[in-house]
Amino acid sequence: MSFRFDRSVFESADFNERLRERLTGALNPKSRRHVERADEAGNEDDSSGHQRKSGGSLDILKNDIIVEKVDFSRIPNLEILDLDVGLGVSSISSGGGGSSMMKGICKISIEGAMLQVRTVIESNLLMLSMADSPEFVTPTLITNDSFSLPITMTFSNIKMEAISKVFFVARNSGIGISFDDVVLDFKFDCSIKILQTTIEKRLKRAMELLFKDTLPTALFNMSQSWFTNSDGSRSSAKHKKDTCDENNQPSAPKIIFEDADLQELSPANMLRLSTLVSSRQTLSLHSTVSSTLSLIPGCLERQNLYRFISRMPSLSNYYSSYVDHKKERAGTPSLLMNKRPSVDYLLRRSSSSGNSLMSSQAYFDKESNLLPMEVLEENAYDLDVITDIQNKLYMRSTDHDEQVNHTKPRRRKIKIGKNKKDKPAYKEEIEQQEPVQSTITVSMPFEEPQIIIEHNDETEAVKEERESVLSSPKLIRSTMDKTYTNSRILNTLLQKNGNLLDEETRLRAQSIDSVAHTKMGYLLGLNHIATPPPPPYY
């Protein structure tokens, strides 16, 4: 088997024109099938009918994709990496002599190519959605017209490198091809600049589908015209392809319920469905169901905003039942109910601010979070309930401040029963002990001493204080870590005139605490008195 490449095919002007026609047919297989069926049936069919794709997404194309211009400034470079030419095994085993078969791996490089396409898209997506929705859930709109946008896309400076696998059997009259390791780069320009970035991202993701399905199909269809010799085989191949297209065509969406099925449905379910449909077709502020906050779970309707706010935890809401019951028994209207704001007032407040829910919530938190006077007078309040309500209001306000100002408020927390870690253990044991009052009495023989005072510079006030202290000294109460004296004048006298005091004064001064007695005995010179040793931290 031999083959050759004719470079003149790529250099001729007809190559770009034929490639443009093939790409246009490959990009619009659905419209081509519609036109063929319309010609066969004898009636014209709208080729721009909107249908859903097999993936479930809406088809926004209102017209065919027309390839306006294709230009290969440079001839594509084709490099054969592997080639296997032989006879088919199935044909040899059947005794038919075999058919020519070729398998090869090639590297394709394209540089400097340009492609320009144009189409018309539908921008009213609501019209496309309602075209496929059942009638019993489709609302009635005042206007739902089409809004078409023509768009032109230009791909310039296309650079592509890919590894392709080619499979050819002469008897099958076609070439099978697949692409692997595709590297593609291009410059994109769109007539609608606001959509250019979005379309470019989606096109780059759609290139995988282009090289896996669209381009191999176009090359296969093109190869059929090259290797088909008889009209019979061409018509049979065309018939097989049309049959395959009809089987692969996505079926139109079907209505779930028919007239016979509606009779078997529950009347209660149909009533709920009709109520749901009617609620979606009205702009009234009055709810269709007064006992519920919202017909749709997780959503809050505007007309039910007041009932939602009235159920928020607050002191007035919690004790309103108590006050209302008391007013009903007394035969007078409730003052608390008269103080509640109207719905119009809440709507005016919500329209003046950006967040209607937070604005109305702030009103109830600040204006209506009041404890009724009747509850205070009759002591009908509960401190635990009031604390719980105030905590919820505080946490709600702090959450709102944290979302708006991005600052977390500080809150003082007191923990009971927590020991201090930095305090020594032996000090805690000492503080738990009760202070002990002790008295030491020393008996010594009394002798009248001779006191000689050479000079006296003391004032009269000091003399009177000294005489009163010496005549009736007081016992000193002390603990293990602190020592108190009853007079600074006594300490001054003992330090300055300790050697000049008589024996009676010495005996009276000895009736003090054990810790103070150690210091006082040292000052008075009573070293023979046995005293306990001082504590380690004294």
UniProtKB/Swiss-Prot annotation:
Is Mitochondrion a UniProt keyword of this protein? Answer: yes
Q: Name one GO cellular component term.
A: mitochondrial outer membrane
Q: Name one GO molecular function term.
A: lipid binding
Q: Which UniProt keywords apply?
A: Lipid transport, Lipid-binding, Membrane, Mitochondrion, Mitochondrion outer membrane, Transmembrane, Transmembrane beta strand, Transport
Kindly list the places in or outside the cell where this protein is found, as annotated in its UniProt entry.
Mitochondrion outer membrane
Q: Which InterPro entries match?
A: Mdm34, SMP_LBD
Any one Gene Ontology BP term = phospholipid transport
According to its UniProt record, where is this protein mainly located?
A: mitochondrion
The segments labelled Disordered in the record are 26-55, 231-251
Domain SMP-LTD, first and last residues per copy: 1-224
Membrane topology field: Multi-pass membrane protein
Homology family: Belongs to the MDM34 family.
Subunit organization: Component of the ER-mitochondria encounter structure (ERMES) or MDM complex, composed of MMM1, MDM10, MDM12 and MDM34.
Q: What does this protein do?
A: Component of the ERMES/MDM complex, which serves as a molecular tether to connect the endoplasmic reticulum (ER) and mitochondria. Components of this complex are involved in the control of mitochondrial shape and protein biogenesis, and function in nonvesicular lipid trafficking between the ER and mitochondria. MDM34 is required for the interaction of the ER-resident membrane protein MMM1 and the outer mitochondrial membrane-resident beta-barrel protein MDM10.
Domain comment, in the record's words?
Lacks alpha-helical transmembrane segments, suggesting that it resides in the membrane via beta-sheet conformations similar to those predicted for other outer membrane proteins and porin. The SMP-LTD domain is a barrel-like domain that can bind various types of glycerophospholipids in its interior and mediate their transfer between two adjacent bilayers.
Name of the protein in its database record: Mitochondrial distribution and morphology protein 34
Q: Could you tell me which species this protein originates from? A: Candida glabrata (strain ATCC 2001 / BCRC 20586 / JCM 3761 / NBRC 0622 / NRRL Y-65 / CBS 138) (Yeast)
Tell me the gene name: MDM34
